[in-house]
Structure formats: C-alpha cells, structure tokens
Amino acid sequence: MSPAKPEPGRIGPSNVARAFDEHARSYDRLVGANRSYHEHLRMSARRMGLRDRGAGLRLLDLGCGTGASTQALLDAAPEAEIIGVDASSEMLSIARAKTWPPGVSFVHASADDLASAGITGFYDGILAAYLLRNLAEPNAALRAFHALLKPGAPLAVHEYSVADSARSKAIWSAVCWGVIIPMGKLRSGSADLYKYLWRSVLDFDGVEAFTTRMHATGFVDVKVQTFPGWQQHIVHTFLGRRAPEPDTPPLGLNLTKVDPPSD
C-alpha cells in the first residue's frame, strides 16, 4: 500500500521534508544522544558486505539526514566515494558542516526525483535509512534504486516495521508516547514531527509486505535482519541486490533471514 495523503495541517509524504527543515537541529541533537541509533546504522552498513574497505566503490546514502547514516557507510567503507542525498535542505546543511574526508559529498534532492539532481547510475551499493515509509510511492522509489545499482550490487533498507506483530506495535507505541514524543516536544517545542514518526511506523508495511515489495521491484536474495534490545523486531535491515550478470561471483552480503516475532 502507498501512504495516505496527509490531512490539512498533518505531516505526511508531501510535506515531511519541510517538517524536517523546521526541526533539523533538535532532531540532530536527539539522535546524537542515542548510541543504539548509530550502532544499528553501522550494523546495516556492515551487513551490505562491502569489500576492501570500499576501495574503488561508489555508494549512495539516500535519506542521509544530518549524516548519521553517511558516517555509518564511511565506517564500513572508509575508502569509498559516498554521496549523501536528502530532501531537507536544513538537515543537509547540518550534515555538510560536519567533518568529512574528500570522498564524501552531499546533494539536495528528493528520493523520488533523483535524476533531476544528477543522481544517475551506476553505484556499487545503496543505503536507505528511515526513508521508504516517508515516500508517497515506495514501489516507484525501489524501482529507481534498482536502476541505479550495478548488477550484483546491494541495497540495504534500514527501517521500522511493526505491522506483523501486536507485541512490536505495543512496544513501539509505549516508547513513542513515554519517551520519544515528550522528549521531542521538550527539545523542539513541538511534538508534531514525533507524532508523525509514531503514526508513520504503524502505517508502514510489515516485514512480509516489504520483502514482497522488494521482490516485485526486481531485487533478488532478499532477506531481513533485526537488532538487539527493545528495537528487536521493530527496526530491521532489509537486504537485497540487483541480479548479477551470469558467471559473476556472489558478493559477500551478510544475508541472514530473521526469525519472526512471537506475540
């Protein structure tokens, strides 16, 4: 399913970038204080199986925000060329102000219109963190990501997915209303973005539905892994790749199917 259009005054796919513009600095401070947020991004980047410290590789970080996922890719592939892309100009401004090696750059673009910003193939890997549930047409986005990849190259979608588990939904709602939403309001003066985060996760695909999307949009070797801690069966790495050319050696993807949650 595609995300519903937002009601007037509510955050949704059509205006989420503007909401992140308004809350960029407080959002960066919040995620900066969350150690597991950064460690889980690093785990997703490592799960892509990028070889040789990324030497000679060209990687995309879609939905890079203020650069946390970019840093995760850089940690996994320090010798790669990495391009971070985000639709929020204020989030990108914060990302650009951080210290990066020469191989890292940033582009202001919407993930559903990458070509107009000069983002064209081919890439050796794509990381898309906390992005797909914010897009109006996730299938179209996945097809575009597939077209940007070299044959055999991986896509890692780092995302919340709770729809398949009543337990996961309950934990997610408890954490949001007990911690995330109050803390977001305290830091920024408004809870709107953090209420949107809560709602958008509940509305997003379950694990089975999203893996079906990936298969339907051309990805092969699709598998899922989750994370330890309270985020288990709440945050996932969805891994897949563009089909390789015949006789191409397989990539070293860390593709392990995750056990389903038990309610």
Please annotate each region the language model reported.
Residues 217-220, 226-261:
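Core SAM-dependent methyltransferase catalytic element
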Residues 1-26:
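N-terminal, positively charged/glycine-rich alpha-helical extensions of SAM-dependent methyltransferases
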Residues 139-154:
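A short glycine-rich, Lys/Arg-flanked "PGG" loop and its adjoining helix->strand segment in the class I
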Residues 124-138:
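A short SAM/SAH-binding and catalytic strip from SAM-dependent methyltransferases
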Residues 112-126:
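A short acidic, Gly/Pro-enriched loop at the edge of an enzyme's catalytic core
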Residues 31, 161-215, 226:
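C-terminal alpha-helical "lid/dimerization" subdomain adjacent to the S-adenosyl-L-methionine
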Residues 35-55, 72:
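Conserved alpha-helix/loop element of class I SAM-dependent methyltransferases that forms part
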Residues 58-114:
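Class I SAM-dependent methyltransferase SAM/SAH-binding core
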